[in-house]
Curated annotation (Swiss-Prot):
GO terms for biological process: translation. This is Large ribosomal subunit protein uL3. It comes from Mesomycoplasma hyopneumoniae (strain J / ATCC 25934 / NCTC 10110). The gene is rplC. The keyword rRNA-binding applies. One of the primary rRNA binding proteins, it binds directly near the 3'-end of the 23S rRNA, where it nucleates assembly of the 50S subunit. Belongs to the universal ribosomal protein uL3 family. InterPro entries: Ribosomal_uL3 (IPR000597), Ribosomal_uL3_bac/org-type (IPR019927), Ribosomal_uL3_CS (IPR019926), Transl_B-barrel_sf (IPR009000). One of its GO terms (cellular component) is cytosolic large ribosomal subunit.
Length: 230
């Protein structure tokens, strides 16, 4: 399974040669450094640890300085393990060229935090009756309904109640790669990805792989030629 670390730049749109607009997410994918090799002999599973985005020197910690020195690099801000991703040695780099247009990937990030919210917005619960005893104002009709059986004498775990909305780990599956820009270290995906701008993302090969597609032919202004995404 291939994987790489990136940062969300934002969203835009591209046009095909047929004039169809495609909403796309642009992800910055710098060179990832292999900072650790994990093997079955020592850890009972195979994986590599990738790191990206330099830390400020004022935030270096002594243990991580030694850890990253083994890979001949400086401490990084974003570190993740990728299982069953082999063929690399300690200190090698992994770049965006491991992917190609037409492939599908899963993108994991932290969704936007929206603060405190009630159950209607947070869990899509129904609003109560506005008449026949529903009460006046907005509060009574927007309250949570039943919290469980009366014989339980307690509120069981997992009940849908008001609380913080968003800021959760979210994975969007099977996003199509529209373009790979190795010169600028950018990956262009069809659709949206979790999180705000500048948030860190984990990009992996899709688990649920749709039928393969031919790369989209993009329209280029002031040109009579169509561009295959290479």
């Amino acid at each position: 399974m291939k994987g790489i670390l990136g940062k969300k730049v934002g969203m835009s749109q591209l046009f095909t040669t047929e004039g169809i607009a495609i909403p796309v997410s642009i992800i910055e994918v710098p060179e990832n450094i292999v900072t650790k090799i994990i093997t079955k002999e020592k850890n009972s599973y195979d994986a590599i640890q990738l790191a990206a985005f330099d830390k400020k020197q004022s935030r270096f910690l002594k243990p991580e300085i030694g850890h990253f020195a083994k890979a001949n690099t400086k401490p990084k801000r974003f570190i993740k393990e990728f299982r069953d991703f082999q063929g690399y040695k300690l200190g090698q780099t992994v770049d965006v060229s491991i992917f190609s247009p037409g492939e599908f990937v899963d993108v994991t990030g932290t969704s936007k935090g929206k603060g405190f919210a009630g159950t209607i917005k947070r869990y899509n619960q129904a609003i109560g009756p506005r008449s026949h005893g529903g009460g006046g104002g907005s509060k009574p009709i927007r309250q949570t309904g039943s919290l469980g059986d009366i014989s339980g004498n307690k509120v069981v775990k997992g009940m849908t109640m008001p609380g913080r909305l968003g800021h959760e780990k979210v994975t969007k599956q099977s996003l199509e790669i529209i373009k790979v820009d190795k010169e600028n270290n950018l990956l262009v995906l069809k659709g949206s990805v979790p999180g705000p701008k500048k948030s860190f993302l984990v990009i992996k090969s899709a688990i649920k792989k749709p039928n393969p597609k031919n790369p989209v032919s993009l329209f280029v202004p002031n040109s009579d030629k169509e561009v295959k995404n290479e």
